[in-house]
Amino acid sequence: MARRIHQPLEDQEFDFVLSMAPGPVLAYFTGTWPKAAPACRAMDTVVGELAEEYGARLTAVRTDMTRCPGTTRRFGVTGAPTAVLVSADEAVASQAGPMTGEELRAFLDTHLGELG
């Protein structure tokens, strides 16, 4: 069974999830418009698998850009999909565009290693 991925319905819910996370948060921003939808659905699968693999080291949050516009602006996200690694309420790394499992794993390993 895949580890649960949080899906906030509004900015305040995103902030709540962020405040309750015991460590780093992978916020991946998605969109529902036609050009973004296929890549975002593919990222759902990739993030789901890695959330299971990383377990308690990481909290995954699927962030709909339309439902969480303040969060989207706060982290400087301009397109979907975009992955943002957040620690202590600050973005420590971001990567725009779809990623394979290997690419996302490399992104996480690099930046989680920098966090200690």
Residue spans of the language-model regions?
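N-terminal "domain-start" segment that seeds a small globular fold
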Residues: 1-17
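Thiol-based oxidoreductase modules, predominantly thioredoxin-like and allied folds used
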Residues: 6-10, 29-31, 43-44, 48-70
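CheY-like receiver
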Residues: 16-17, 71-74, 107
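Residue-level signal for alpha-helix termini/capping positions
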Residues: 18-19, 52, 112
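Short active-site neighborhood of thiol/selenol oxidoreductases, capturing the structured segment around
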Residues: 20-35
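Structural micro-motif
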Residues: 23-26, 69, 75-84
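Conserved phosphotransfer microenvironments
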Residues: 37-41
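Non-catalytic, surface beta->alpha helical segment in thiol-disulfide oxidoreductase systems
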Residues: 79, 84-116
